[in-house]
């Protein structure tokens, strides 16, 4: 809370911490990591990938085959902000129609920037729920989104799949146990491999970054007293 002159009255604990930023304030490392992992055809499709949609729809609604890997970043954005994730044909159809419409109304950079500004990224070092890449960068590594290194970007890009599980921090802001930290670290290595697989990283860089110790970059816990 602030006075009219913008001086601080007090800090208020919020249920969700989010700091929207412009696309040019987000590191290309994050953008490449997200595209490589979540939607490698992002630049070429028009909102949906028909074969992937059919496979995922049959998996999630009818229980046939796999339910993963069918949603583009555009669909994920619609799912997060508009239609939810109920496993019904009606919901999936609405998601597809809205994704196609969104691609006609926004360019790729706008869609990617919006996705990165609203997606959930788990918890920060105070145990607060965070959304958006800027809050994630500040709350996990203590840097701005534009300054994230490749390993840091890979870690953050992997979080939206399962934000609380992969977050390095517990609900009280403390660092998780070594065993539980490994879940997010393994996910980050998967992201790095996807970056290599799709050509975003050379083999040499992939091997170097895969050996990097991300735990030394996590900022110290600063839990909020309840």
Predicted feature residues:
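Terminal hydrophobic membrane-targeting helix
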Residues: 1-29
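Preference for short coil/turn "hinge" residues that link or interrupt alpha-helices
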Residues: 5, 14, 19, 41, ...
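Short, solvent-exposed loop/turn elements at domain surfaces
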Residues: 8-11, 42-44, 165
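Acidic/histidine-rich, surface-exposed loop or edge segments in extracytoplasmic proteins
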Residues: 10-20, 35-37, 56, 76, ...
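Short capping/connector residues at structural and topological boundaries
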Residues: 14, 26, 47-48, 53, ...
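Surface-exposed beta-strand edges and their flanking turn/coil or helix-capping segments
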Residues: 14-16, 24-27, 68, 169-171, ...
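Flexible, acidic/glycine-enriched loop-and-adjacent beta/alpha segments
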Residues: 22-73, 125-141
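Non-catalytic, structured segments within soluble enzyme domains
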Residues: 73-226
């Amino acid at each position: 809370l602030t006075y009219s002159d913008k001086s601080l009255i007090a800090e208020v604990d919020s249920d969700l911490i989010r700091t929207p930023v412009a696309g040019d304030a987000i590191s290309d490392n994050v953008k490449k990591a997200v595209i490589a992992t979540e939607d490698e055809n992002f630049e070429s499709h028009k909102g949906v990938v028909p074969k992937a949609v059919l496979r995922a729809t049959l998996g999630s609604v009818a229980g046939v085959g796999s339910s993963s890997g069918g949603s583009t970043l555009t669909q994920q954005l619609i799912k997060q902000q508009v239609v939810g994730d109920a496993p019904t044909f009606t919901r999936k159809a609405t998601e597809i129609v809205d994704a196609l419409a969104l691609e006609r109304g926004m360019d790729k950079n706008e869609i990617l920037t919006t996705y990165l500004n609203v997606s959930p990224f788990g918890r920060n070092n105070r145990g607060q729920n965070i959304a958006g890449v800027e809050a994630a960068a500040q709350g996990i590594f203590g840097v701005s989104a534009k300054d994230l290194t490749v390993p840091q970007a890979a870690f953050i890009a992997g979080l939206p799949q399962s934000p609380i599980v992969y977050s390095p921090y517990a609900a009280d802001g403390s660092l998780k146990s070594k065993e539980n930290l490994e879940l997010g670290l393994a996910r980050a290595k998967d992201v790095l491999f996807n970056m290599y697989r799709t050509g975003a990283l050379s083999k040499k860089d992939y091997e170097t970054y895969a050996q990097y110790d991300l735990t030394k970059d996590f900022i110290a816990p600063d839990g909020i007293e309840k």
